[in-house]
Amino acid sequence: MNLEKYSERVRGFIQSAQTMALSRNHQQFTPEHILKVLVDDDEGLAASLIERAGGNVRDVKLGVETALEAMPKVEGGNGQLYLAQPLAKVFSTAEELAKKAGDSFVTVERLLQALTMEKSAKTADILAKAGVTAQALNQVINDVRKGRTADSASAEQNYDALKKYARDLTADARAGKLDPVIGRDDEIRRTIQVLSRRTKNNPVLIGEPGVGKTAIAEGLALRIVNGDVPESLKDKQLMALDMGALIAGAKYRGEFEERLKAVLSEVTSANGNIILFIDEMHTLVGAGKADGAMDASNLLKPALARGELHCVGATTLDEYRKHVEKDPALARRFQPVFVDEPTVEDTVSILRGLKEKYEQHHKVRISDSALVAAATLSNRYIADRFLPDKAIDLVDEAASRLRMQVDSKPEALDEIDRRIMQLKIEREALKVETDDASKDRLVRLEKELVGLEEESTEITAKWQAEKQKLGLAADLKKQLDEARNELAIAQRKGEFQRAGELAYGKIPELEKKLKEAEAQDGKAGMVEEVVTPDHVAHIVSRWTGIPVDKMLQGERDKLLRMEDEIGKRVVGQGEAVQAVSKAVRRARAGLQDPNRPIGSFIFLGPTGVGKTELTKALASFLFDDDSAMVRIDMSEFMEKHSVARLIGAPPGYVGYEEGGALTEAVRRRPYQVVLFDEIEKAHPDVFNVLLQVLDDGRLTDGQGRTVDFRNTLIIMTSNLGAEYLVNLGEDQDVDAVRDEVMGVVRASFRPEFLNRVDEVILFHRLRRKDMDRIVEIQFKRLESLLVDRKITLSLDHEAIEWLAAKGYDPAYGARPLKRVMQKELQDPLAEKILLGEILDGSTVKVTSGSDRLNFRSKPTVVATEAAA
């Protein structure tokens, strides 16, 4: 006996059988030991062969176990095993069978065959009693082998290769496991057309990720099962190849090729009855290629060219260009079928078809208006993904969120339960007290506790009953779905009596029960069970940060008072505040042009009048955070090439993978304020990039991705024409110099750029009367810095007037005032705090002197503590 002639699996079994014989204290190594390890094998090749040959595996296991138990045991032996004569004959028979079949190695099935044939071995009787005959087993082995010989030590791995490395889509379609495929008739028809060709009958579905390429393959499987295909495709099997399973565990060179050859051999020997579906087809190129080995695509080419292999591929446009088109020999063997993104209307139809499956899974109802909202909102607000995938995901997540709410405790019940817990803790504390007041309190508390516990029990029962009703409707939907699948199977098999019972008996009855259950659910209760457009809008807002969901009354009031809110921070610029507020209100009311940014403005005015401050105030108003904006300082973009910093470097340049400062910020957060500060400082060519942003609300970055700017508010600031605005009189309006200022602007920017901006807003130079208000705003900021120290500041009217007069300079706006306040107020205050003249918790009154401010400090903490 030469072990080199045996396959790896058989060698492993022989070793396991020896170990088992020693562990059972047997002295002889017999055929029963071999049969025992064969039928106990996890991968179950021997067990599968016995079943297919008409035998009972359970009977074999019982028979072999009984035989092993009856064997003599030798305690305290020398650990040696003796080969029994019957087993030697079994090995000899197995080697002869392998030689006769032209095999290079003795495989598991030949060993099993020898166990049935060798009459001197008890295993032949055990297998015969279980219903296995040598003739039946031989027939099954020939079916499994399909004419192939065992040429390698791992030959068993390649039996039933399609079962291991592919999924039968037609079997899934028959079992009703596939989602219905709605629409896509043209693409499926085109795929069938290519499959029906004589040669090169291999379509490849090419489209963006998420447009439904895999769904088309599933649609083809459903059509084959329903017989809705031409004669040439009737009763074909569509198998989805799993490239991951094919490559996984192929450790040695040649193992991957062997597996793939086994798959191809099975497909070829099926005489065109198997169509192979390869999802992510680009993975074929280079798959398994290592140390000079052939990759999968080269192994497939000959079979594809001869028409022996029927194949449907699917890949994205980018991957097809990157991998498949580079190999023209592979590309010419496939016929591209382009799959476009469906329209919003088609997406709604697709969602309607899938609705039942999602209702069944989440056990909630999904309204039709929610499906329409999912299609329209995803199309408008989720720019970097494709329909119908993004719309399906929205519906799925909205239903998941609602289900989570249904399973969570209602708010009213949660509040009562928390109150009960609080009272129970209080009761335990009061039990220790002996005074009358505590005893009275305990009696009252016990009474309240009883009432709350009754209320809690009542609400819990009501909530559980409503949940149960929802569960009943979900169960009925599941039963209805199963009944419809059963009806389809019965019609396909021609079992018309069963089909009639289902169509006119069971299905109408279930539909009636479901209608009644849904009518019960429809009544208002504690549990919300229908997914509405509001739920979908909430998910969109969570994904993108864009406020699409329904405005609450508080937000409406806030938007209507927007001018007043921003006016608290920006002084003397009513026209600018109003223009920006109107743009935001238009956007939130849904009346803005959906293909342009929310608004685009150029703020013109002298330095220090509040151009950048207005933008910060706007970001703070919309997002409660001054820094919630993209601020691009255009003074950094004075060279022509610096535009790459905005949109990202082109391919081949350093930093290509990093993306641009502007495009990446907006991609991550599509709803925000974008500020281009000091635009006149930038190189004129930089503005060419902004033309598409201002007109179409989109920009293509260095990597070719389209970034959506339709939900941004674009503000540009500039000092152009400031000299005209500074020289205006105290009571003169900016319209008096508008033409002169616009003349300077037109000389600096191209007409096509200015023509795309919504409005050019001129900022007034700050008047003397505005300065008092600015002093108050700056003073409030200083007060907020002292909150931690509990120091209270107060500034009298004369001090405000003194600071405003000292800090007023029409040419420089509010910035000189900031410097004056720093020098005259903050610096002396800091010194006094450090010297200990002003203590934490003091009240400081600031008054004006002839040439400086006076500080009077009065400690308040001590008094407060004494009172306490």
From Swiss-Prot:
InterPro entries: AAA+_ATPase, ATPase_AAA_core, Chaperonin_ClpB, Clp_ATPase_C, Clp_N_dom_sf, Clp_R_dom, ClpA/B, ClpA/B_CS1. The Clp repeat (R) domain probably functions as a substrate-discriminating domain, recruiting aggregated proteins to the ClpB hexamer and/or stabilizing bound proteins. The NBD2 domain is responsible for oligomerization, whereas the NBD1 domain stabilizes the hexamer probably in an ATP-dependent manner. The movement of the coiled-coil domain is essential for ClpB ability to rescue proteins from an aggregated state, probably by pulling apart large aggregated proteins, which are bound between the coiled-coils motifs of adjacent ClpB subunits in the functional hexamer. Its main location: cytoplasm. Homohexamer. The oligomerization is ATP-dependent. ATP 1 binds at residues 207-214. It comes from the Bacteria. Part of a stress-induced multi-chaperone system, it is involved in the recovery of the cell from heat-induced damage, in cooperation with DnaK, DnaJ and GrpE. Acts before DnaK, in the processing of protein aggregates. Protein binding stimulates the ATPase activity; ATP hydrolysis unfolds the denatured protein aggregates, which probably helps expose new hydrophobic binding sites on the surface of ClpB-bound aggregates, contributing to the solubilization and refolding of denatured protein aggregates by DnaK. One of its GO terms (biological process) is cellular response to heat. The lineage of its organism: Bacteria, Pseudomonadati, Pseudomonadota, Alphaproteobacteria, Hyphomicrobiales. Residues 3-147 form the Clp R domain. This is Chaperone protein ClpB. The gene is clpB. Belongs to the ClpA/ClpB family. It is found in: Cytoplasm. Residues 342-545 are annotated as: Linker. CDD domains: AAA (cd00009), RecA-like_ClpB_Hsp104-like (cd19499). Residues 160-341 are annotated as: NBD1. Residues 392-523 form a coiled coil. Residues 6-71 are annotated as: Repeat 1. GO terms for cellular component: cytoplasm. Keywords: ATP-binding, Chaperone, Coiled coil, Cytoplasm, Nucleotide-binding, Repeat, Stress response. ATP 2 binds at residues 605-612. Residues 555-765 are annotated as: NBD2. Residues 83-147 are annotated as: Repeat 2. One of its GO terms (molecular function) is ATP binding. Residues 766-868 are annotated as: C-terminal.
